[in-house]
Amino acid sequence: MILFDQLTRNCFRGTDRAFAYDGAALELSRRLTKDTELVNELPASVLHFIGSPFLHSENLEDHDMALALNGVTLAKNETAAMYARPHIINHRDIIARFGRYPHRNKAMERDNTEEETAWLESDEVPGWAKSQMK
């Protein structure tokens, strides 16, 4: 999970290569979370990494899964879950608004909509999104 989801994001910031293994990471997260017994046994720190690909997905249903996983984390480590929750909601809100992450458009060779351009030029863009913009 760390190799597919985190390493590429940090090594290849601002390029399409940052997202090259998102599909593999997401598939692994989906497979792992289907096993509810396993999910209930794992510590909060592991659930955090299993949940990351859901946050990085441009599918709103995956963000709902991240919120559900955060609920499981809450029962194990309230502090960790409450720290992560605003970040999960922030990511989800962007997907709900645009249907994708506008800050990836340049790297993914996608055209911005007018609304996306206005957002990208605003102070609303979170730091984690700015870090992927070149």
Give the location of each predicted region.
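Intrinsically disordered, low-complexity activation-like regions
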Residues: 3-134
